[in-house]
């Protein structure tokens, strides 16, 4: 039997994959993917599941049909680490921190962590993957509850409900102080048009509000279907009377609401956040409230939870605050308990988990052979989606694998998953892997098709090149379009290094590392020198340059690899070169 391979030796942590011996999943002989194999436990062979925070009774009852359930609440870290070595699964909400020390203390027995809710900020995913522990969540059951809470905060804020309630309970009768604003005819900008955002939009429409939304990857027809207008981020925040945040917390959205964005808003705007605390720069919001740019804010989530006792934002008279109650309805908590219980039980049985957020198991030999192609597939997906004009909505992706191998000798499921990961994960809080990629793509309305191009020659390399096309979208870089109008990028592995070899109709030779500037230009002498000079003057290190052209003296595309992101001023200088017709900066 082949030995298990430490993932860190062949993949970066972002790939979120672990391996299993080849005898468990021999290629082309068994297509089922074994996620977890439950070891023998006490209690007549039943696994043991530890629940550390209150879970709906329906979920507990479901767990007890399959496992021995230990409900131990308010455990210290030391107590949790002591108990965990006797448990096969752990179920938590947001209050239990599941860090590396917990996985180390489990001594390899802990196989599944279930998060009763959506966010997994309190679980160390890297450590979970390293220790071979699957992490699942319950992302759907609390959608309606979160949307209802968002609307409740919206209306309570507009009519000063919390402040008026506190006043009358203090024995006062000050009606004039709490004159509110009407919602009818006002513009609500919903930032993030996922499940919760779209439900908030539906309800706001019912209140007579004009609803606009910004989500760069939401299809416009999906928004139109419920009477919502899809607009740019700048239009959304500058025209809204109310803003409701429904964004995942990612590197791109962290502190998205800051001094700069507040300055772009209407004076007197009102903001609701039932998403993630970190999307708002809380110090900047406090300044915006004090200056009157933001008239009121209604917050259910905070950067640090619970907030400190004397938190100025919570105490501000224009802020309505609740202690992370978005999912706190009896119905939602029962639904979440059932959803997480089903996911944990299924994982312990070795079934596929559509809500897995870190790591399925795949054959060792497949990982070894496809390692550079996995990186190539993800980078091509990431590059292609950055070429899409915001608001176009990605709904049709085609992946082509050119190979001299027979179709049944090339397992592309992992590559397909990584293309999806590259396209969706940068703009989502969802972690994409082999298990949940198709599920997430379908959920977001993205249709993925694949085709094989059989080449003549030796099957020494599993794949000669991979092509990713995105159809029915507008491109930020017109030269990336194929003859049929699709965004098209193509790449291959050269000496173990993933490389970009084609953009649209133009051939290039670009190592897919760092970042790249693509420029379309008139093919004439001196262009490389002009661009290199601008970058050098701004201390931007150039790692490579490549030029592809249709014919001498006609159009050409130049690809410039850079180690860091140039400033806007630097990019403008490049764009101002007369012979350059268009350019785009892409993070790889």
UniProtKB/Swiss-Prot annotation:
Coiled coil: none annotated. One of its GO terms (biological process) is photosynthetic acclimation. Induction: Up-regulated in the aerial parts by dark treatment. Not regulated by high CO(2) levels. Its EC number is 1.1.1.95. Residues 516-588 form the ACT domain. It catalyses: (2R)-3-phosphoglycerate + NAD(+) = 3-phosphooxypyruvate + NADH + H(+). The active site is at residues 276, 305, 324. Keywords: Chloroplast, NAD, Oxidoreductase, Plastid, Transit peptide. One of its GO terms (molecular function) is NAD binding. Residues 1-38 form a transit peptide. NAD(+) binds at residues 195-196, 215, 274-276, 300, 324-327. Partially inhibited by 1 mM serine. It is found in: Plastid, Chloroplast. The keyword tRNA processing does not apply. Disruption phenotype: No visible phenotype. GO terms for cellular component: chloroplast; chloroplast stroma; mitochondrion. Pathway: Amino-acid biosynthesis; L-serine biosynthesis; L-serine from 3-phospho-D-glycerate: step 1/3. Expressed in aerial parts. Not detected in roots and meristematic tissue. Expressed in cotyledons, adult leaves, stigma and anther filaments. Detected in the embryo. Disulfide bonds: none annotated. Involved in the plastidial phosphorylated pathway of serine biosynthesis (PPSB). Belongs to the D-isomer specific 2-hydroxyacid dehydrogenase family. This is D-3-phosphoglycerate dehydrogenase 3, chloroplastic. It comes from Arabidopsis thaliana (Mouse-ear cress).
